[in-house]
């Protein structure tokens, strides 16, 4: 039987474990306040639903979008970065629309990582930061992130200790 080496390298999915614990507690009748996956707990606002319904009726929208996302959306993204962070970005080469953050990070990892490339990832972290680079055949190096450790010192130390130098550093806030 063939092995699936990339899948076997994946750590347990912590959000799946938390969900199982939550479901078990609810089955026992416990009252759970869920601070988990960020699923909405309120309905989508009516004006958004109305606009989506309106857009779904336009025949021009009955096709696949361009692969990088609609230009006006990419322009809005780069304008937002300029307004909020005073960063100039080119909507044609430095902005892309993805289905969501997980998909974007996973595809980024596949695009920039070669087998054996090392990647610095904070721990704890959002699971996709680890999963994406393992699935891209990279080597994940965990950098401690806690009140007891200066993260940037730990990051610099991890960078200096590894050769060849890590190709990617995940910085998330």
Q: What feature does the model see in each segment?
A:
Residues 2-4, 8-99, 107:
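N-terminal small-domain helix-loop-helix segment of the aminotransferase-like
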Residues 31, 118, 139, 165-167:
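Structural signature of beta-strand start/N-cap positions in the alpha/beta core
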Residues 33-36, 142-144, 168-173:
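Short beta-strands and strand-loop turn motifs
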Residues 99, 108, 123, 172-173:
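Glycine-rich, N-terminal phosphate-binding loop of Rossmann-like dinucleotide-binding domains
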Residues 111-133:
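Conserved PLP-anchoring active-site segment centered on the Schiff-base-forming lysine
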Residues 123, 142-147:
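Short beta->alpha connector loops at strand-helix junctions that form conserved
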Residues 134-140:
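A short helix-loop-beta submotif of the ANL/AMP-binding
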Residues 147-173:
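Active-site phosphate-binding strand-loop segment of PLP-dependent enzymes
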